[in-house]
Curated annotation (Swiss-Prot):
This is Large ribosomal subunit protein bL35. InterPro entries: Ribosomal_bL35, Ribosomal_bL35-like, Ribosomal_bL35_CS, Ribosomal_bL35_sf. Disulfide bonds: none annotated. HAMAP family: Ribosomal_bL35. Keywords: Ribonucleoprotein, Ribosomal protein. Residues 1-20, 37-64 are annotated as: Disordered. GO terms for molecular function: structural constituent of ribosome. GO terms for cellular component: cytosolic large ribosomal subunit. Belongs to the bacterial ribosomal protein bL35 family. GO terms for biological process: translation.
Length: 64
């Protein structure tokens, strides 16, 4: 059986931590930021953990 390929879209969007959790960037922070409150843009900064229901599917795409 050939080697499974990593889903390239998933590899760009998700990252696995050292403990095996999958994290992602939050949405709504790419452009058109000037009319969004600073409070909102601060809240959207950083990474957040993927929901438990989505994790197995993403893990499969990342060949985990």
């Amino acid at each position: 059986m050939p080697k499974a390929k990593t889903h390239s879209g998933a590899s760009k969007r998700f990252r696995r931590t050292g403990t095996g959790k999958i994290v992602r960037q939050k949405a709504n922070r790419r452009h058109l930021m000037e009319h969004k409150p600073t409070k909102r843009t601060r809240r959207l900064a950083g990474r957040t953990q993927v929901s438990a229901n989505d994790a197995p599917r993403i893990n499969k795409m990342l060949n985990g």
